């Protein structure tokens, strides 16, 4: 009875979140000169704070998937690899993270285009909820080829019919990356050589749409003779004139692709992780911009709830949040995944920016 009550509460919450809100996720991938790979992404939800937390999962930890209607007996899996993930709503719903083998995985909303297989109670033992798929991937695999081989052995479902479907990005330490989209009840696995992912439409469509922007170039367009007058750019950056700036998934995909592709390659994976946060600043969604007039979310500083970068070379997870833009890090090398206990903690212990006063020479220090 207690587990069914828990299911009902979680299903209601995630159903409301996915059905009624505006959500926007933007992901990029950077590779450094030292052969390091960094994946980074934002997560947006502008209705309310999503109970964001980080979760540490040890080796050998056993999880069982939730199922529709509060059914029990979902896919049970034990962690071959320890991992760290950023979760929403409850600790097992890891949205993005990395395991000790350097495999990164993330969930991105995919409304209107995904179609999971119809839930069949007779297949409960190999059925997993979409919000637990990242945990399954991080706990069981070290390469994208392993994930590719296993993904169609399970059945992915949503615990609430109102919820949006999702698609997933998986990257390993070699830089290999795949996108998983479930349509017509079957997983389609795409090699992702570009490294960018947002939301709907489907990934092949997003790639084709890039062809609309073949005219964009980095830098400044040169002067053009226009009859008797000479046309000149007003300022730097005119080569990107026409780059989409709105918050729709296709526009964010194009913008992320161009900013990622033309950003300067960094020397180290650490530098790439720092660069990723600068790039993703372009995708912060100011609170209220995705809503109709009069529908104003309250008690939140931003619709971009958090941003994460996973450094698969150094095995460090970095994040900041809407409450505190100061970067925090979790070094997987310093975690004994054989002995640490499963645990989960809020991303912010204090919901306030870290502001460091500048001490002015000669000014009083007691203020």
Regions found by a protein language model. Give the residues of each.
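C-terminus-biased signal that marks the final domain/tail of proteins
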Residues: 24-38, 46, 52, 150, ...
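Sec/Tat signal peptide C-region and signal peptidase I cleavage site
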Residues: 18-24
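A contiguous strand-loop segment
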Residues: 26-122, 162
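Bacterial N-terminal signal peptides that target proteins for export
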Residues: 1-10
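Aromatic- and glycine-enriched pocket-lining scaffold segments that form the walls
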Residues: 144, 148-182
């Amino acid at each position: 009875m207690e587990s069914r009550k828990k299911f009902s509460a979680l299903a209601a919450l995630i159903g409301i979140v996915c059905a009624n809100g505006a959500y926007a996720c933007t992901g990029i991938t950077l590779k450094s000169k030292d052969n390091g790979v960094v994946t980074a992404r934002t997560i947006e939800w502008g209705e309310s704070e999503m109970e964001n937390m980080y979760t540490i999962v040890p080796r050998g930890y056993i999880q069982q998937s939730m199922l529709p209607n509060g059914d029990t007996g979902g896919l049970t899996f034990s962690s071959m690899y320890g991992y760290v993930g950023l979760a929403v709503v409850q600790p097992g719903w890891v949205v993005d993270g990395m395991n000790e083998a350097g495999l990164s995985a993330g969930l991105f909303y995919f409304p209107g285009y995904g179609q999971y297989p119809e839930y069949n109670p007779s297949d409960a033992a190999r059925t997993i909820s979409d919000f637990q798929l990242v945990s399954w991937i991080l706990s069981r695999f070290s390469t994208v080829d392993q994930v590719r081989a296993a993904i169609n052995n399970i059945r992915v479902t949503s615990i609430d019919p109102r919820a949006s479907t999702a698609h997933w990005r998986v990257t390993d330490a070699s830089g290999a990356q795949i996108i998983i989209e479930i349509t017509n009840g079957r997983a389609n696995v795409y090699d992702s050589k570009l490294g960018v992912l947002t939301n709907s439409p489907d990934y092949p469509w997003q790639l084709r749409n890039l062809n609309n922007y073949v005219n964009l170039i980095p830098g400044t367009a040169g002067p053009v003779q226009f009859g008797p007058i000479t046309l000149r750019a007003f300022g730097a950056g005119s080569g990107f004139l026409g780059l989409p700036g709105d918050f729709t998934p296709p526009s964010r995909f194009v913008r992320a692709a161009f900013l990622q592709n033309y950003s300067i390659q960094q020397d180290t994976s650490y530098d790439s992780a720092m660069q990723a946060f600068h790039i993703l600043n372009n995708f912060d969604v100011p609170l209220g911009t995705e809503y109709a007039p009069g529908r104003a979310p309250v008690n939140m500083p931003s619709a971009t709830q958090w941003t994460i970068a996973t450094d698969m070379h150094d095995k460090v997870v970095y994040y900041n949040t809407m409450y505190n833009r100061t970067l925090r890090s979790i070094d997987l090398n310093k975690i004994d995944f054989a002995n640490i206990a499963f645990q989960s903690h809020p991303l912010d212990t204090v919901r306030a920016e870290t502001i460091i006063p500048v001490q002015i020479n000669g000014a009083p220090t007691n203020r």
